[in-house]
């Protein structure tokens, strides 16, 4: 299930474009996640008051959290699958503190791909999308394994 060197290159090339506006991309990802999967909002006490797209769009806290999410994901992606040291603390907080189900990681993965495809259509063709899907699946599978180590079936 590992990625080839070429696939990692595709993932990291497009991720460079994401990092050029990490806050904008992160904000869009979370807004889309909460719109497409409203049940995910229940896991974020500080965002429960954001009921409308305009409220979400105007929320600096949501924008900041979106940047945090994608920054952490970027650190993991840059490890090209050798991400144990970055993944373990993230999995621990998501399993024991936030209790984020693996299904929600699937949801956000889908949204990340949609947002990148919309913002960077010319640079994110079928091959790059397939590579990103594979990288995010590797991330999710490894998170799920860590969840089990922490006693969370997520």
From Swiss-Prot:
Heme b binds at residue 94. Residues 2-148 form the Globin domain. The keyword Cytoplasm applies. O2 binds at residue 65. Keywords: Cytoplasm, Heme, Iron, Metal-binding, Muscle protein, Oxidoreductase, Oxygen transport, Transport. Its main location: cytoplasm. One of its GO terms (cellular component) is sarcoplasm. It comes from the Eukaryota. It is found in: Cytoplasm, Sarcoplasm. InterPro entries: Globin, Globin-like_sf, Myoglobin. Monomeric. Monomeric heme protein which primary function is to store oxygen and facilitate its diffusion within muscle tissues. Reversibly binds oxygen through a pentacoordinated heme iron and enables its timely and efficient release as needed during periods of heightened demand. Depending on the oxidative conditions of tissues and cells, and in addition to its ability to bind oxygen, it also has a nitrite reductase activity whereby it regulates the production of bioactive nitric oxide. Gene3D superfamilies: 6.10.140.2100, 6.10.140.2110. Its EC number is 1.7.-.-, 1.11.1.-. This is Myoglobin. It is an enzyme of class 1 (oxidoreductase). It comes from Gallus gallus. The gene is MB. It catalyses: Fe(III)-heme b-[protein] + nitric oxide + H2O = Fe(II)-heme b-[protein] + nitrite + 2 H(+); H2O2 + AH2 = A + 2 H2O. Belongs to the globin family. It holds the Pfam family Globin.
């Amino acid at each position: 299930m590992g990625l080839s060197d070429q696939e990692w290159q595709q993932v990291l090339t497009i991720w460079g474009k994401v990092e050029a506006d990490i806050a904008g991309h992160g904000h869009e990802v979370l807004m889309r996640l909460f719109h497409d999967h409203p049940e995910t909002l229940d896991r974020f006490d500080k965002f429960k008051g954001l009921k409308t797209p305009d409220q979400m769009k105007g929320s600096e806290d949501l924008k900041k959290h979106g940047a945090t999410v994608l920054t952490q994901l970027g650190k993991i992606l840059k490890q090209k699958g050798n991400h144990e040291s970055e993944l373990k603390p993230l999995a621990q907080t998501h399993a024991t503190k936030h209790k984020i189900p693996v299904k929600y990681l699937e949801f956000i993965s889908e949204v990340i791909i949609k947002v990148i495809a919309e913002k960077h259509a010319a640079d994110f063709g079928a091959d790059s999308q397939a590579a990103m899907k594979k990288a995010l699946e590797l991330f999710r599978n490894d998170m799920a394994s860590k969840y089990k180590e922490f006693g969370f079936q997520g």
